Amino acid sequence: MYIALLGRQPEISLAELAAVFGVDNVNRISQQFAKVQTDQFDITTLGGTIKCAKVITEFPASRTDKASLLAASRFITQHYQAKWAHSPHKITLGLSAYDLTVSARDVQKTGLILKSSLKKSGTSLRLIPNDQPALSTATAHNNKLGNSPHKVELLLIKTTDRRLIIAESRGVQNITAYTRRDRHRPKRDAFVGMLPPKLAQIMLNLALGAGSLTGQKSCGNSVTRSASSLSDKSMVLRTALPDAFDLEEMAGSRPVVTILDPFCGTGTVLQEALLAGYDVVGTDLSQKMVDYTAENLSWLQSTFTTPGRPVGRVIDIHQADATTHRWPNSTHLAAVVCETYLGQPFSAPPTPQKLAEVVGNCNHIITGFLTNIRPQLAPNTPLCIAVPAWYDASGQATHLPLIKNLQKLGYYQLNRTPLIYRRPDQIVARELLVLKSIGKTVPQA
């Protein structure tokens, strides 16, 4: 059993966990956390999880948060005194408390008590200082907490049903790696938008685990589904892949999984797909973007390929209009993942007339794309596409009209709740649509 610290957009983080592990195995336990029933949890494959930790114990919370912390402190001291006594390794320890009204000093006391106790048995412990009750992502990452049995972060979480969970970190979001894959690429273009690599990673997981989102509904703080468990990648692929796709087709010993991005821009979706081991096809209306993508993917392959970690293959990158193009072998695509045309950027809410113009333009282009590609896809091909949504000063959103007509366009929408990726005060947000193609494939002439 694991717990996951959700990202800034918790609904998106939850949807990703549901797609990867299966909704029956994901339960929201607080505003910030979900519990995940699984034996394995690799945080590097998830863009929406900030920290993950293995549950060590849980018990009813006390009447006050300070009493709960005291009970947790007793357990931690007893459990880890026995575990680490006479350890030949120096222990690095961090402590984080969530949803407990306690001070950083109160949390630190638990570590100091354990440090003193271990010193008597000859074990050296370095305690990471707290300036807040919970350690930041950067602090946990920079101290490599969760990366080895000797570098540990203990998470104390009070749940909404008043239980106290003590969990041992198994990793934190690698902010250094994301920065390298984003800002260190040879080609970037702020004008066309810069899709964060972790959002691209989320979108790939949503698409390839799309089958697990079917029938998703809210049930208190939990997320439920009727499909089978998707706790490993092969099961995710078997649930999500289109009818015409043959998972047994192999390249060496690796299943052939091909991702298409018809709006590839600078190649962020494709690079994350390559790192996950998938083959990629990319197109863009702009030859400049095609050139940028090709250079970025070449950099990625030369930078990140190692003997123990091969990346996927670049099958084709070329210039094409997504509203009219015919993609070769499109019935064999595993998924379509893309950030579509987001329209004009705004630093302040536009006038109603300007907004109507931009909405109409984006709606026309994206409708044209969905109409064009649908008959080229095998039935049940999953898509995860980012489309624009516009927010006014009061926080009210304007959505694309096409969202209400997806079935007429030949798609089922699998996410039942809106998945909005947006910074505070951002005018143009990204709305994620998780879709499945319906209808028959039209043979190419």
Each language-model region and where it sits:
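Extended, charged/glycine-rich binding lobes that contact polyanionic ligands
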Residues: 110-131
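Class I S-adenosyl-L-methionine-dependent methyltransferase catalytic core
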Residues: 1-55, 63-71, 99-113, 137-153, ...
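Short, charged beta->alpha transition segments
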Residues: 66-86
